[in-house]
């Protein structure tokens, strides 16, 4: 039962958290203004004095930071002592306060080491960069401990860490990713201070110049890391909100998405304005806010008694799994037949970009990493859709339906694949390729599976964009950038997808109708569907000719595309005239051959 004393302590705990955020921001101001050496190499004294006399501006700034940090230390110590007295033994708030005191001690020691070893002002050593990252990580841990203490003091329940399956893994990876992002941001901010640039273009050129200082070369990675982490954090947030569906987790996940969007916007403005001090502080404040919001999301989702959707309505035993799953069952989770065409467009995207052979390492990275990322998306899709899959003949034998693989194990498998796939693409190709693959996964799971599929017949048009990412991955793996031609490949698949999938939807419309999925034939009927297919087939044919106008492809591709498009339009016309299963099957099968041969023709044309 919550007592008035506990309420007062909770209010104090929230105040201590806020104070420490402000102190940390002021510490960033000290670094950004180059005032870290304002007290010389002395600590805890300032230039050998307890209170500096006739100080310079830099000395005043550094001394003020030390004074406010001292107050922060005392406030955390008081919080710890108060928690010991107010809460009974075993209460999580006592643990949180003790953890906060520990990280406050280490925070002070790391800050002292920066001063005592001279890693301030204009120092450009690797040691300073490493300690700067450690300092940032420790600050994150300190704020998290204070946030947990305030949460528990306010009546939040204890956490259940065991048996959380993929939710626990997703949250752990999210915290790890945000920590990594913050550390990369600390190094980038240090580079902005020590190696200022006149423009964004100059920053990019210098970061790609061999022999430049490591702080300069690392600068270009932070934006890509920010996008990658942002995609994952938003994905993890909404997935956790789906699997732990309380009003609070939903609000936190939604707030996290908006807040991270604001953080990315602030980062872009920071780059455009060449990192002024005030913008650096705002950017860091948003980073702290994102971190704390994710901590609260994790705490809410992992509380004892939280509803666990992945276990099903019938209780834990319903989707526990029957045991005896083989490697074939896990392979089936990835939908290898579906992936084959996605992988083909990714690999041929690499061949098209390279105008020939891209190299064995890149080719294998795209093949293996691409398969893992797509397989992860498909496995998550099987878990989310297992209720309707059980009622459709085409999907009734999937491992998540037959329960040969439990929902928990399927999600763990999916997250493992996603992490490994991202790592393979980053290591074997580059971060841009890995980020694009992650974007495709998130689009398929969040936009298509979780949001659009059961809401609107536009699900295929919008959600189908997920299938257009593979050629971007292949292209980026080779070139490290996305040209206009790469986006043309994206557009081609985007407009081709409705032709392909609506033909399938016509074939199995009774299944979709039975489970209430609003595919186009179910909502508007066969006539409207075949008209839409014909229109998208015409758009696909027109888009396929665009590279010829841009001078990117030659006569070989022209001949192949004319033949392939003629057949596509003829089969679409045949379906329009006779909207029956036989013509739908014919178009469905040909659409796959069409896309594969069109990409092959591009690759051959650019190679010869």
UniProtKB/Swiss-Prot annotation:
Assigned GO CC terms: plasma membrane
Under Enzyme Commission nomenclature, its number is: 2.5.1.141
Instruction: State a single Pfam family of this protein.
Output: UbiA
Q: Pathway it acts in?
A: Porphyrin-containing compound metabolism; heme O biosynthesis; heme O from protoheme: step 1/1
Say what the protein does.
Converts heme B (protoheme IX) to heme O by substitution of the vinyl group on carbon 2 of heme B porphyrin ring with a hydroxyethyl farnesyl side group.
Q: Supply any other comment.
A: Carbon 2 of the heme B porphyrin ring is defined according to the Fischer nomenclature. Protoheme IX farnesyltransferase subfamily.
This chain belongs to which protein, by name? Protoheme IX farnesyltransferase
This chain's source organism reads: Thermus thermophilus (strain ATCC BAA-163 / DSM 7039 / HB27)
What is the gene called? ctaB
């Amino acid at each position: 039962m919550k007592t008035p004393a506990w309420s007062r302590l909770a209010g104090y705990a929230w105040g201590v958290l806020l104070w420490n955020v402000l102190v940390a921001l002021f510490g960033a101001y000290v670094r950004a203004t180059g005032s870290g050496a304002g007290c010389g190499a002395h600590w805890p004294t300032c230039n050998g004095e307890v209170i500096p006399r006739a100080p310079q501006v830099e000395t005043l700034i550094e001394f003020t930071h030390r004074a406010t940090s001292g107050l922060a230390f005392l406030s955390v110590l008081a919080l710890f002592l108060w928690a010991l007295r107010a809460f009974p033994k075993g209460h999580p708030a006592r643990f949180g306060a003790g953890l906060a005191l520990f990280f406050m001690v280490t925070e002070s020691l790391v800050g002292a080491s920066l001063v005592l070893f001279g890693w301030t002002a204009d120092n450009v050593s690797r040691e300073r960069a490493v300690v700067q990252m450690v300092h940032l990580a420790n600050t994150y841990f300190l704020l998290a401990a204070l946030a947990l203490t305030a949460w528990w003091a306010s009546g939040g329940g204890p956490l259940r860490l065991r048996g959380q399956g993929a939710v626990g893994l997703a949250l752990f990876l999210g915290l790890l990713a945000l920590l990594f992002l913050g550390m990369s941001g600390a190094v980038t901010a240090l580079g902005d201070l020590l190696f200022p640039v006149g423009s964004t273009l100059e920053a990019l050129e210098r970061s790609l110049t061999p022999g430049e200082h490591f702080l300069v070369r690392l600068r270009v990675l932070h934006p890509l890391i920010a996008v990658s982490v942002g995609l994952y954090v938003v994905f993890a947030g909404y997935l956790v909100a789906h699997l732990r569906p309380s009003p609070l987790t939903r609000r936190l996940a939604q707030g996290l998405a908006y807040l991270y969007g604001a953080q990315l916007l602030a980062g872009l403005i920071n780059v455009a304005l060449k990192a002024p001090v005030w913008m650096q502080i705002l950017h860091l404040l948003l980073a702290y806010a994102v971190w704390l919001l994710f901590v609260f999301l994790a705490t809410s989702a992992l509380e004892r008694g939280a509803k666990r959707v992945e276990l099903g309505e019938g209780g834990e035993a319903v989707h526990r799994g029957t045991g005896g799953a083989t490697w074939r069952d896990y392979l089936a989770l990835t939908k290898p037949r579906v992936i084959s065409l996605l992988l083909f467009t990714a690999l041929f995207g690499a061949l098209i970009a390279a105008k020939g052979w891209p190299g064995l390492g890149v080719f294998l990275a795209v093949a293996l990493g691409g398969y893992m990322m797509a397989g992860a998306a498909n496995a998550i899709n099987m878990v989310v859709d297992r209720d309707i899959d059980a009622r459709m003949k085409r999907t009734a034998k999937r491992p998540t339906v037959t329960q040969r693989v439990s929902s928990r194990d399927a999600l763990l498998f999916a997250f493992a694949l996603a992490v490994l796939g991202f790592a393979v693409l980053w290591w074997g190709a580059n971060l841009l390729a890995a980020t694009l693959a992650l974007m495709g996964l998130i689009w398929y799971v969040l936009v298509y599976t979780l949001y659009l599929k059961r809401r609107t017949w536009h699900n295929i048009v919008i959600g189908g964009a997920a299938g257009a990412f593979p050629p971007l991955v292949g292209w980026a793996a080779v070139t490290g950038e996305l040209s206009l031609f790469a986006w043309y490949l994206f557009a081609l698949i985007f407009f081709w997808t409705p032709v392909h999938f609506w033909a399938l939807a016509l074939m199995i419309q009774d299944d979709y109708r039975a489970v209430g999925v609003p595919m186009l034939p179910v909502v508007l009927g066969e006539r409207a569907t075949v008209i839409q297919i014909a229109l998208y087939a015409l758009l696909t044919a027109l888009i396929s000719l665009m590279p010829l106008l841009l001078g990117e492809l030659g006569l070989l591709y022209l001949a192949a595309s004319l033949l392939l498009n003629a057949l596509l339009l003829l089969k679409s016309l045949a379906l329009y005239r006779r909207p029956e299963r036989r013509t739908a099957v014919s178009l469905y099968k040909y659409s796959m051959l069409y896309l594969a041969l069109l990409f092959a023709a591009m690759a051959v044309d650019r190679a010869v």
